[in-house]
């Protein structure tokens, strides 16, 4: 099971649709959590659903024929054979999140997470060398899907650390 993760707005769901069109069995971790009720509660300050990641990941392991799991928490599943972290320049990400109508506080929280490599760091702490990092900035969804396909086939390697948006925080 390959897990595709990244900050909200980097293109995970769009990419998942393309991979599905290419014949892969893809599931959204967020949809699974909501549909199966893998919810522990709600964050009292931010209002986010708190997911029962262990239960969701355990359920995923039982699913047959599953190729790809996408979602911004998917890298927390220890059973991922490979993790691909999608990255996007924070200024481009800002436009996408604002376009979705995210409140300013949520936009800033996600921009900071992207600039600080939060998903990449978390993924690497759990999965080590099985993590790949792809900068989607300036690339079409199909170009990103081609890169992901190459990574999945072993013909391309995109180790973590090659994408750095930390300078955005200082600018």
UniProtKB/Swiss-Prot annotation:
Catalytic activities: AMP + ATP = 2 ADP; ATP + H2O = ADP + phosphate + H(+)
Region (LID): 99-109
Keyword field contains ATP-binding: yes
Binding residues annotated for ATP, in chain numbering: 9, 11-14, 100
GO molecular function, one term: ATP hydrolysis activity
Gene Ontology biological process terms, A to Z: ribosomal small subunit biogenesis; rRNA processing
EC numbers: 2.7.4.3
Top-level taxon of origin: Archaea
Pfam families given in the database record: AAA_18 (PF13238)
Segments for region (NMP): 28-51
Sorted UniProt keywords: ATP-binding, Kinase, Nucleotide-binding, Ribosome biogenesis, rRNA processing, Transferase
Any coiled-coil regions, as ranges: none
Oligomer status and interactors: Interacts with uS11. Not a structural component of 40S pre-ribosomes, but transiently interacts with them by binding to uS11.
Family note: Belongs to the adenylate kinase family. AK6 subfamily.
Chain's role: Broad-specificity nucleoside monophosphate (NMP) kinase that catalyzes the reversible transfer of the terminal phosphate group between nucleoside triphosphates and monophosphates. Also has ATPase activity. Involved in the late maturation steps of the 30S ribosomal particles, specifically 16S rRNA maturation. While NMP activity is not required for ribosome maturation, ATPase activity is. Associates transiently with small ribosomal subunit protein uS11. ATP hydrolysis breaks the interaction with uS11.
Name of the protein in question: Putative adenylate kinase
Organism: Methanothermobacter thermautotrophicus (strain ATCC 29096 / DSM 1053 / JCM 10044 / NBRC 100330 / Delta H)
């Amino acid at each position: 099971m390959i897990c595709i993760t990244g900050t909200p707005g980097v293109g995970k769901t769009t990419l998942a649709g393309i991979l599905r069109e290419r014949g892969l069995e893809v599931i959204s971790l967020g949809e699974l959590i909501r549909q199966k009720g893998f919810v522990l509660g709600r964050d009292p300050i931010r209002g986010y659903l708190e997911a029962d990641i262990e239960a969701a990941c355990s359920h995923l392991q039982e699913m047959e024929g599953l190729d790809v799991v996408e979602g911004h928490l998917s890298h927390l599943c220890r059973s991922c054979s490979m993790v691909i972290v999608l990255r996007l320049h924070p200024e481009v990400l800002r436009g996408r999140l604002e376009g979705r109508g995210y409140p300013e506080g949520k936009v800033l929280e996600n921009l900071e997470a992207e600039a600080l490599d939060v998903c990449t760091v978390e993924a690497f702490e759990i999965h080590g060398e099985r993590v790949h990092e792809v900068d989607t900035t300036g690339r079409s969804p199909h170009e990103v899907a081609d890169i992901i396909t190459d990574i999945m086939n072993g013909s391309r390697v995109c180790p973590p650390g090659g994408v750095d948006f930390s300078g955005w925080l200082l600018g």
